[in-house]
Amino acid sequence: MFPTVTEFMNYGQQTVRAARYIGQGFMITLSHANRLPVTIQYPYEKLITSERFRGRIHFEFDKCIACEVCVRVCPIDLPVVDWKLETDIRKKRLLNYSIDFGICIFCGNCVEYCPTNCLSMTEEYELSTYDRHELNYNQIALGRLPMSIIDDYTIRTILNLPEIKT
């Protein structure tokens, strides 16, 4: 007789424990019900990137002194710098500067260590193409400033600010 009573008590304890676990899960589900959705409708809504966002690199041809510091600090030796030594003034003259964004890891070392600040990171992150050779940008393509997301009237911008808990 006692084994049946203890089995019945164990069954009751297990039932109460299971109901408590289901209740805890249900409370978590209800706490998420009143939050705003995380998903954005991408082509029509875009997040405003932070100031420190590392997007496409912008290059200013006139400031570059062809010192090749960007090539030396790049972990994959990516920027291609072609220059010619001007013997009469004994300075390097920049001929071509290009970066292949299909290979670039967007680490930002080239921007950080550039002595003349001719490189900067932009907020542009839409670099998708159908041909990978289109990701090889020369100094003309790198010199174009991207259109700001904030200025585009066809796109609804969403601030990407962390929630402040009070």
Swiss-Prot record:
All residue ranges annotated as the 4Fe-4S ferredoxin-type domain in the record: 55-84, 95-124
SUPFAM superfamilies the record matches: 4Fe-4S ferredoxins
Broad class of where this protein is predominantly found: plastid
Record bears the keyword Nucleus: no
Catalysed reaction, written as an equation: a plastoquinone + NADH + (n+1) H(+)(in) = a plastoquinol + NAD(+) + n H(+)(out); a plastoquinone + NADPH + (n+1) H(+)(in) = a plastoquinol + NADP(+) + n H(+)(out)
Gene3D superfamilies documented for this protein: 3.30.70.3270
Cofactor(s), by name: [4Fe-4S] cluster
Tagged with keyword Transmembrane helix: no
Compartments in which it is found: Plastid, Chloroplast thylakoid membrane
Binding site for [4Fe-4S] cluster 2: 74, 104, 107, 110
PROSITE patterns registered for this protein in UniProt: 4FE4S_FER_1 (PS00198), 4FE4S_FER_2 (PS51379)
GO biological process: photosynthesis, light reaction
Keywords: 4Fe-4S, Chloroplast, Iron, Iron-sulfur, Membrane, Metal-binding, NAD, NADP, Plastid, Plastoquinone, Quinone, Repeat, Thylakoid, Translocase
Residues where [4Fe-4S] cluster 1 binds: 64, 67, 70, 114
GO molecular function, one term: 4 iron, 4 sulfur cluster binding
Gene Ontology CC terms, in alphabetical order: chloroplast thylakoid membrane
Cofactor: binding details: Binds 2 [4Fe-4S] clusters per subunit.
One Pfam family hit: Fer4
EC numbers for this chain: 7.1.1.-
The protein's role, per its UniProt record: NDH shuttles electrons from NAD(P)H:plastoquinone, via FMN and iron-sulfur (Fe-S) centers, to quinones in the photosynthetic chain and possibly in a chloroplast respiratory chain. The immediate electron acceptor for the enzyme in this species is believed to be plastoquinone. Couples the redox reaction to proton translocation, and thus conserves the redox energy in a proton gradient.
PANTHER family xrefs: NAD(P)H-QUINONE OXIDOREDUCTASE SUBUNIT I, CHLOROPLASTIC (PTHR47275:SF1)
Entry's family note: Belongs to the complex I 23 kDa subunit family.
Subunit structure: NDH is composed of at least 16 different subunits, 5 of which are encoded in the nucleus.
Protein's recorded name: NAD(P)H-quinone oxidoreductase subunit I, chloroplastic
